[in-house]
Amino acid sequence: MAMERQMDMQWWLDSKFGLFIHWGPSSVGGVEIGWDRRSHPYDHPGRARIPDAEYDQYYTRFNPVEFDADAIVLAAKQAGMKYIVFTSKHHDGFANWHTQMSDYNIANTPFKRDICRELADAVHRHGLKLGWYYSTRDWYHPDYLVGDNSKYNDFYHGQVRELLSNFGKVDLLWFDHVAGTWADYRFRELFEMIHKLQPGILVNNRAARFVFGHKAGTPDPELAELVKGDFDTPEGKIGVFMKDRPWESCIVMSRPADGGGWSYRPEAITRSFAECAKTLSACVTGRGNLLLNAGPMSTGQLRPEEMGLLKAFGPWMQTFGEGLYETQGGPYINGEWGGATIRGNDLYLHVFEWQNGALALPALPREVLACTELGGEDVACRQDSNELSLTLSGEKNRDTHSIVKLSLADGTDIPLIPTDVASTAREQVSALEDPMGDN
């Protein structure tokens, strides 16, 4: 990674944890945002449950009078999240701001207030970083894929321009999918505009997602590199350990039995705090971030279970955050047992599975000066030339996995250390994985 880009990304690399918010008129029906709309002018059949005429009228009843941007932003901040990515527009084409490019927007609902404006102001007010999710795919717009593609480019470039011009500092742009051919889009023009309007902004890997992998022609290497963006976005799963390519897993807090759960679905079951905390550690030890998704209700509030989950993270992060923030995954490569992070001479073992209160790992090339479990009990540590062994001293009950801090003596950089066959395979696969591939 070039030094200048490394500096632009450092805040994100250090942050580890963000809040994803999917919200719009679909919450009125309690259906999946975008995907439950029947017509998809694209080759993915989707869920397709709700007739267009019904879905496209949800906005006439969208009146989230209990929406409080400050309350949501503060809940994220108190949970230890450092940035928020909000759905400005999803695949259904509805804009959560007062866009001049379309009448299908929040200004024409009973609510009328500019949700993006209120959210952006709250994020800036409380010191977090702001990201916009923007779906280039638009199943409402008459020119998307089936009409005048030049007009569609003008439309979506215009909306992106508004998002990057009218809301102050924007730190991240999170595109989501587009189909068609390379000739259908003006990607160079788009990226030039993005970086001119918001120097230093980060862009994910989905600006041209699904153009890759189709019979759409082959772009020149410079264009392919441009649209690859700054980081990958494994969806609904934990990314693999990658040495040289940043990534961020996006995962829902609440999931219905039939999948999805990005937006509010009343039947969805919220994951346990222990599962979410483990997921965060699994991402960070793999050198990734976690973007944990919430879907507000039609009232504008988060469902109580999701708000409770955010509240549970607060005290946990106060105790365990030092093993996450501003660290780098490694040197131990993730295995079934857990993974590791390191910052300077402090190495943190995120232990998901103890074997009768013990853990054995390959030896480190540095002396271990001290060993303690964060928020827990004393840990006996012994290291010889072949093995590092840890043993818990008691039978303390734990609500979540353990994070054990090792204080190391000064020494040379520690190389990556495979801990089992599976972790070695994951590292090899990560080097071959197409960062534009489908997640």
Map each language-model feature to its residues:
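Mature catalytic domains of secreted/periplasmic carbohydrate-active enzymes
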Residues: 1-439
